[in-house]
């Protein structure tokens, strides 16, 4: 079941920044996530994404791993270095293979990883989890929203 954003969270940050060099992916995610009630900005380069992140806060940065100017891992690392308070999620076109290096890395860094072609329910679940974690962390003050969850 795909859960729509609850009306009680409308006053909180519900902005998602999607970074991918593929226009079709950006268009799909914008249309789909906006249909669920999220505010979505799409950007095709990491350089432009950093400019956008300085303008306003996003609770989630959803980034492709393989991009021409900077890969998703380096991009996330730089976001953390700049102390930008956002949750992160990765996307990859490699598809899910439990033996693939990307899956092993994903389990190590503990950021959600969405595999292309996308499963809509998994996208909705990953976004809602990131949203809940972001706002819980801000309220509790226990950790920076840029830090991945330390539990398995």
Which ranges hold each PLM region?
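Non-catalytic signal-transmission and effector/linker regions of two-component phosphorelay proteins
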Residues: 1-15, 121-152
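Two-component/phosphorelay signaling modules centered on CheY-like receiver
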Residues: 23-41, 108
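Receiver (REC) domain active-site loop signature in two-component systems and cognate sites
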Residues: 67
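Acidic, metal-coordinating helix/loop segments flanking the phosphotransfer/catalytic sites
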Residues: 42-60
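A Lys-centered signature of the CheY-like receiver
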Residues: 116
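Active-site residues of response regulator receiver
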Residues: 20, 64
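Hydrophobic/aromatic residues positioned on beta-strands within the core alpha/beta folds
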Residues: 91-93
